[in-house]
Amino acid sequence: MLPEPININKWIEENGHLLQPPVNNYCLHRGGFTIMIVGGPNERTDYHINETPEHFHQLKGAMCLKVVDDGEFRDIIINEGDSFLLPGNTPHNPVRFADTIGLVVEQDRPETALDRLRWYCSNCREIVHEAAFHLTDLGTQIKEAILAFDGDKESRTCKKCGTLNYSKPQ
């Protein structure tokens, strides 16, 4: 039997408290693709690299999608009501502000696919650390990788300039 439609606005009213740091997401659907509600604010400095495309739709407020586009760091502002399809293999850091909510759709990963979280030096933009893993649970694995980075001072220290980096903006 098919499930009933979900009223997204009602779901947010009743379940907004489930959107907790550091990722602030809640998976509404899994199977073929994942549909997530993501709230703000978030506090992350990592850039996610997903081999498959990601679709962002901003339901409330605006967000800033920091990307590395052909080697250049730039910001893409996604305003309330806007949708944006991010191509696969694009390093991105979704910056969500307070009292904002978005919907993100991601394709299930092929068994050979690796997701990566990459941290760039806050001072010189060199790659400081990268964690790679086959993603099976968006709700837990990204958080685990962030916490592991945060707990490893050597991984957070830039080999080029010596700057100590953090998993949260300072």
UniProtKB/Swiss-Prot annotation:
Catalytic activity entry: 3-hydroxyanthranilate + O2 = (2Z,4Z)-2-amino-3-carboxymuconate 6-semialdehyde
GO cellular component assignments: cytoplasm
GO molecular function, one term: 3-hydroxyanthranilate 3,4-dioxygenase activity
Cofactor annotation: Fe(2+)
UniProt subcellular location: Cytoplasm
Residues annotated to bind substrate: E54, R96, E106
Binding site for O2: R44
Keyword list, A-Z: Cytoplasm, Dioxygenase, Iron, Metal-binding, Oxidoreductase, Pyridine nucleotide biosynthesis
Binding site residues for Fe cation: H48, E54, H92
Keyword Iron: yes
Amino acids binding a divalent metal cation: C121, C124, C158, C161
Keyword Iron recorded: yes
EC numbers for this chain: 1.13.11.6
Pathway membership, UniProt: Cofactor biosynthesis; NAD(+) biosynthesis; quinolinate from L-kynurenine: step 3/3
Top-tier EC class: oxidoreductase
Functional description taken from the UniProt entry: Catalyzes the oxidative ring opening of 3-hydroxyanthranilate to 2-amino-3-carboxymuconate semialdehyde, which spontaneously cyclizes to quinolinate.
Family to which the UniProt record says this protein belongs: Belongs to the 3-HAO family.
Annotated protein name in UniProt: 3-hydroxyanthranilate 3,4-dioxygenase
Protein's gene: BNA1
